[in-house]
């Protein structure tokens, strides 16, 4: 299965069978910031934004004072799982980032998708990839 298939058929799929109820954007990036696959809606990001995200996985709390930036958009960092999951909020939407051994799984949501639904979608794929050795 290609990385793009994971994005298109899993991360961007309708949630709980509700047509049109899906993440706003998603991507799988290598831990070095290289894009493995992304939705057409995923924001163009700066390398230093990924560097800062990786630093927060290594040093939990690093992003809390400044916020998480992706594609120039600022997210307020909310409770995640230190070293494994970063969650952010921006208005009525937000972001979930799951770190695996080799990759970062990104999910960006807007209403009507809930934070919990985004977490479920992103973390499910992330956990699967960890189980597969990625």
Curated annotation (Swiss-Prot):
Phosphorylated by MAP kinases. The modification Phosphothreonine is found at residue 114. GO terms for cellular component: cell cortex; cytoskeleton. Pfam families: Profilin (PF00235). Gene3D superfamilies: Dynein light chain 2a, cytoplasmic. The keyword Membrane does not apply. It is found in: Cytoplasm, Cytoskeleton. One of its GO terms (molecular function) is actin monomer binding. Keywords: Actin-binding, Allergen, Cytoplasm, Cytoskeleton, Phosphoprotein. Binds to actin and affects the structure of the cytoskeleton. At high concentrations, profilin prevents the polymerization of actin, whereas it enhances it at low concentrations. By binding to PIP2, it inhibits the formation of IP3 and DG. Belongs to the profilin family. Occurs in many kinds of cells as a complex with monomeric actin in a 1:1 ratio. This is Profilin-2. It comes from Nicotiana tabacum. The lineage of its organism: Eukaryota, Viridiplantae, Streptophyta, Embryophyta, Tracheophyta. The gene is PRO2.
